[in-house]
Amino acid sequence: MIGIDITSTDRIKKMYEKFGDKFYEKFLNPDEIELIKKPETAAGFWAAKEAASKAIGTGIGGSCSFHDIKIKKDALGAPKIKYKKEIRKKFGIKKSHLTITHDAGFAIAVVVNVLKKK
């Protein structure tokens, strides 16, 4: 399954300016917040989590929340994504891949989930 999302960096920046850390806490865990050094990164993480929820066919909501999805960076700074165990099991996810790009004030993320054979 594939999910994609595009997010305005300016929108994320304005939300942070208005609500501060409370805004980040709505969609990021403490480890993810530590990785945020600029609005572009936060926008990329937002887009990544939205794309991940779309890749399981639900969107963000009752079946999958922002906090059911975790983003890390590898040694080279590339983003990595992981769903909570309950989500992986419920949707039969074997492995997940994430890419994030930024251009013209937008963050775009694509998530590809490899599913377990039935």
UniProtKB/Swiss-Prot annotation:
GO biological process: fatty acid biosynthetic process
UniProt-listed Gene3D superfamilies: 4'-phosphopantetheinyl transferase domain (3.90.470.20)
Assigned EC number: 2.7.8.7
Domain of life from the UniProt record: Bacteria
Cell compartment(s), UniProt: Cytoplasm
Keywords from the named record: Cytoplasm, Fatty acid biosynthesis, Fatty acid metabolism, Lipid biosynthesis, Lipid metabolism, Magnesium, Metal-binding, Transferase
Top EC class, one word: transferase
GO molecular function per UniProt: holo-[acyl-carrier-protein] synthase activity; magnesium ion binding
Sites where the protein binds Mg(2+): D5, E50
Known cofactor(s): Mg(2+)
Recorded coiled-coil stretches: none
Catalyzed reactions per annotation: apo-[ACP] + CoA = holo-[ACP] + adenosine 3',5'-bisphosphate + H(+)
HAMAP family, alphabetized: AcpS
NCBIfam families: acpS (TIGR00516), pantethn_trn (TIGR00556)
Functional note: Transfers the 4'-phosphopantetheine moiety from coenzyme A to a Ser of acyl-carrier-protein.
The family this protein is said to belong to: Belongs to the P-Pant transferase superfamily. AcpS family.
The protein's name: Holo-[acyl-carrier-protein] synthase
Encoding gene, per UniProt annotation: acpS
